[in-house]
Amino acid sequence: DFTAGNGTGGESIYGAKDXXXXXXXTGPGILSMANAGPGTNG
């Protein structure tokens, strides 16, 4: 985000809040996760 600069802000430089990511799964059973640190819920 560019409002807080640490992942807790509400605006993205890419536009909409839920913009599509460019990562693709490579096969069945693949799980992708993100985490910004303890107590951040992703």
Curated annotation (Swiss-Prot):
It is found in: Cytoplasm. One of its GO terms (cellular component) is cytoplasm. Residues 1-42 form the PPIase cyclophilin-type domain. Keywords: Allergen, Cytoplasm, Isomerase, Rotamase. Residues 1-20 are annotated as: Disordered. Its EC number is 5.2.1.8. It is an enzyme of class 5 (isomerase). Binds cyclosporin A (CsA). CsA mediates some of its effects via an inhibitory action on PPIase. Do not bind FK506. It catalyses: [protein]-peptidylproline (omega=180) = [protein]-peptidylproline (omega=0). One of its GO terms (molecular function) is peptidyl-prolyl cis-trans isomerase activity. Gene3D superfamilies: Cyclophilin-like (2.40.100.10). It comes from the Eukaryota. Residues 1-12 have a biased composition (Gly residues). Its main location: cytoplasm. SUPFAM superfamilies: Cyclophilin-like. Belongs to the cyclophilin-type PPIase family. PPIases accelerate the folding of proteins. It catalyzes the cis-trans isomerization of proline imidic peptide bonds in oligopeptides. This is Peptidyl-prolyl cis-trans isomerase.
